[in-house]
A protein has these predicted regions:
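Glycine-rich FAD pyrophosphate-binding loop
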Residues: 22-41
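Helical element adjacent to the flavin cofactor pocket in flavoenzyme catalytic cores
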Residues: 132-185, 189-194
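Conserved Rossmann-like nucleotide-cofactor binding loop
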Residues: 13, 36, 193
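Flavin-dependent oxidoreductases
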Residues: 16, 172, 176-230
Length: 230
C-alpha cells in the first residue's frame, strides 16, 4: 500500500502531526511502540506565551498560543471532553528584582493583557516578594489527549502498535519501504529513541532523568503555581 507519510512516535508531537495530516486529507500511518516512560506521558501540558525566567514574551509566543488554543479547543469538540481548559498561572517572585521587572512589564502595551500583579495572599506559601499572574494560560490533560488520539486512529486502522525497527526501513526509488508498505515521507517523532536510530544517532541528544511526586489533596489550589518548578 502507498502512503504519503509514516509517522514514528505517538507522543504529543506525533499526535498533533497526525491530526494535521488527517485534516489536510493526507494518507498516512502512525506507529507507536507503547513505552510507559516517555517525556509526553509526564509532560505538565501547560501552554502560555511567556518565558518565565526572564519574564519575556517568547518568540512569536502570542501567535503560537492562539494557534494552540484554537487547535486544542477543536480537540475538546471532537472528543466531547474537556481535555484542554484555561487556568491562571501564579508566578511566585524569587526577588525584588523579579518583582520590579514584572511590574514594569505590566505597564508595557505588549504585556498589559498578558501579565498582571496578584494582590491576593496565597495561603500556606512563603511569598515574601509577592507574585504575578499570567492571564493567558491553559492546560492540556496530556495522557487523556494521547489516549483519545490513540483510540481514534486505532478505530480507523491508521495506528500501528509496534516498535519501529530502523533496520527494516529501505530506500528505493526515492520512496521509503517499511514492512510491505511504501511511503513518500517519514516524520520521526520518537524523542530520545533517535539515539537508537542509525539515521539520527549522531545528534547530541542527552537523555534527561527526572522524578515525579503525585499529591492527592482536597486542599490543592485550582490555579497553576510556579516558582522555578510547577
Amino acid at each position: 500500500m502507498n502512503y504519503d507519510f509514516l509517522i514514528v512516535g505517538q507522543g504529543i508531537t506525533g499526535s498533533i502531526v497526525a491530526l494535521q495530516l488527517k485534516k489536510n486529507s493526507k494518507k498516512f500511518k502512525l506507529i507507536e511502540g507503547g513505552s510507559p516512560n516517555t517525556s509526553s506521558k509526564v509532560a505538565a501540558g501547560i501552554v502560555h506565551p511567556i518565558s518565565l525566567k526572564r519574564c519575556n514574551l517568547s518568540w512569536r509566543g502570542r501567535e503560537f498560543y492562539e494557534f494552540s488554543d484554537s487547535f486544542y479547543k477543536e480537540i475538546n469538540f471532537e472528543s466531547d471532553t474537556e481535555l484542554y481548559k484555561p487556568y491562571k498561572l501564579i508566578r511566585i517572585f524569587a526577588s525584588f528584582e523579579e518583582q520590579n521587572n514584572w511590574i514594569g512589564k505590566t505597564n508595557n502595551e505588549i504585556y498589559k493583557h498578558i501579565l498582571s500583579l496578584n494582590s491576593k495572599k496565597i495561603d500556606s506559601l512563603k511569598n515574601r516578594f509577592g507574585s504575578g499572574i499570567v492571564e493567558i494560560c491553559s492546560r492540556l490533560s496530556v495522557n487523556e489527549f494521547l489516549d483519545f488520539v490513540s483510540s481514534s486512529f486505532l478505530k480507523s486502522k491508521v495506528l500501528i502498535k509496534d516498535v519501529f525497527k530502523a533496520h527494516e526501513l529501505k530506500l528505493k526509488n526515492n520512496r521509503f519501504h517499511y514492512k510491505g508498505d511504501i511511503y513518500s515521507n517519514i516524520i520521526m517523532c520518537d524523542g530520545v529513541n533517535a539515539l537508537k536510530n542509525p539515521m539520527f544517532n549522531y545528534l547530541p541528544i542527552i537523555p534527561n532523568k527526572g522524578e515525579l511526586l503525585k499529591v492527592f489533596s482536597t486542599f490543592l489550589p485550582t490555579k497553576i503555581i510556579n516558582c522555578g518548578i510547577f
